[in-house]
């Protein structure tokens, strides 16, 4: 009797037909993915993307050259040179470089900064043609901060209750 049932299944291609209908059902179901270059998904406010240096509302850069971000960076991707002290006792950076090739996007630099000068912004589309374009200097970082300031400030404000 068992051989007869097995022969009927083989003759009627029962397993093939069940697999075929399963594939057809999946083929016509809605797709769970998005069409990336044309559609973009929602990015979390805690997303850690391209680095940026922020400015105060009066236009002065926030970084006070404390070098905490350089000290805490596990990948040693940050290099800072502090300028001489100004008349008011503060100091600013002369050189602020981040080697994005070394960076592991851990966010420790952002957490260590006492004035929220260095942040990891919302931009994740910064592919380059050459490796040299991934060595960010102070001007590039300030430009990123100016470009993304509104979104960065909103993300920091929304994340404030959890810090």
Swiss-Prot record:
Q: Where does [4Fe-4S] cluster 2 bind?
A: 73, 103, 106, 109
Cellular compartments annotated: Cell inner membrane
The cofactor(s) it depends on are:
[4Fe-4S] cluster
> What are the entry keywords?
4Fe-4S, Cell inner membrane, Cell membrane, Iron, Iron-sulfur, Membrane, Metal-binding, NAD, Quinone, Repeat, Translocase, Ubiquinone
EC category name = translocase
* GO function terms (MF aspect): 4 iron, 4 sulfur cluster binding; iron ion binding; NADH:ubiquinone reductase (non-electrogenic) activity; quinone binding
Might you give the EC number(s) for this enzyme?
Answer: 7.1.1.-
Q: How does it assemble?
A: NDH-1 is composed of 14 different subunits. Subunits NuoA, H, J, K, L, M, N constitute the membrane sector of the complex.
This one is known as NADH-quinone oxidoreductase subunit I
Q: Which organism is it from?
A: Bartonella henselae (strain ATCC 49882 / DSM 28221 / CCUG 30454 / Houston 1) (Rochalimaea henselae)
């Amino acid at each position: 009797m068992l051989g007869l049932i097995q022969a009927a299944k083989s003759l009627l291609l029962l397993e093939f037909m069940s697999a075929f209908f399963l594939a057809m059902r999946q083929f016509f179901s809605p797709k769970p993915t998005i069409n990336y270059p044309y559609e973009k998904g929602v990015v979390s406010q805690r997303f850690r993307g391209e680095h940026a240096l922020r400015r105060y509302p009066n236009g002065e850069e926030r970084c006070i050259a404390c070098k905490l971000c350089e000290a805490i960076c596990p990948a040693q991707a940050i290099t800072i040179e502090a300028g001489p002290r100004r008349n008011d006792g503060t100091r600013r950076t002369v050189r602020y470089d981040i080697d994005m090739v070394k960076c592991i996007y851990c966010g420790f630099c952002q957490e260590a900064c006492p004035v929220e000068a260095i942040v990891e912004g919302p931009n994740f589309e910064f592919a380059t043609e050459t490796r040299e374009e991934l060595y960010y200097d102070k001007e590039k970082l300030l430009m990123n901060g100016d470009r993304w300031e509104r979104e960065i400030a909103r993300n920091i404000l929304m994340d404030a209750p959890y810090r």
